[in-house]
């Protein structure tokens, strides 16, 4: 079920504060965040966020195409190594 329109997009307050502080300083540094659940807003375009995936911060450069999606969508938490090969089939 999607979020109700009257509530508006959810963004953790500390993410907004960090983004605003970085915009004011003018430096283009990675903003480390742990909030994968926060929605990407138009004022985040052009900034780089380090989204935590449980092990490390994955750098995410925000573009206009990402607006309205969540930060967690761009920082995968699981590593896929492929399906295990059948040992009998390998020997033949």
Swiss-Prot record:
Keyword check for Ribonucleoprotein: yes
Pfam name, any one: Ribosomal_S19
Role of this protein: Protein S19 forms a complex with S13 that binds strongly to the 16S ribosomal RNA.
Lineage: Bacteria, Pseudomonadati, Pseudomonadota, Alphaproteobacteria, Rhodobacterales
Domain of life, source organism: Bacteria
Family: Belongs to the universal ribosomal protein uS19 family.
Keywords (A to Z) from UniProt: Ribonucleoprotein, Ribosomal protein, RNA-binding, rRNA-binding
CC per GO annotation: cytoplasm; small ribosomal subunit
Statement: the UniProt record of this protein carries the keyword Ribonucleoprotein: yes
PANTHER family the UniProt entry points to: RIBOSOMAL PROTEIN S19P FAMILY MEMBER (PTHR11880), SMALL RIBOSOMAL SUBUNIT PROTEIN US19M (PTHR11880:SF8)
Source organism (scientific name): Dinoroseobacter shibae (strain DSM 16493 / NCIMB 14021 / DFL 12)
Example of a GO biological process term: translation
Any GO MF annotation of the entry: rRNA binding
Protein name listed in UniProt: Small ribosomal subunit protein uS19
């Amino acid at each position: 079920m999607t979020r109700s329109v009257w509530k508006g997009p959810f963004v953790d307050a500390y993410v907004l504060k960090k983004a605003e502080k970085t915009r004011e300083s003018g430096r283009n540094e990675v903003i480390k965040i742990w909030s994968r659940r926060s929605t990407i807003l138009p004022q985040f375009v052009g900034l780089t966020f380090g989204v935590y995936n449980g092990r490390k911060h994955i750098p995410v450069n925000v573009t206009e195409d990402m607006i309205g999606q969540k930060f967690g969508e761009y920082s995968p938490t699981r590593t896929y190594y492929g399906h295990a090969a059948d040992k009998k089939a390998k020997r033949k």
